[in-house]
């Protein structure tokens, strides 16, 4: 298994200890949109603070979406996600309620 930078990951990672609580990672996925424009292609970047305008809707009006995902390693060594299509549906419903552009399912599946 490799990171987004192509570095080999530590194979001793204890996948069975993962929970549905916050699990800090080395990277995070970032994507953006403005107004009614479609979502831009996302990217993996090192985990850390994100730059944000003081006028951001999430700060002024509480308009924001977040969806976490859980991954598992199979007995054959593959990494699989736990119901990513459900994550996509929840985020699409949330975007609709907040009058934001829907997040494409491909963000979660591809």
How would you label these PLM feature ranges?
Residues 1-110:
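Conserved alpha/beta cores of soluble small-molecule-handling proteins
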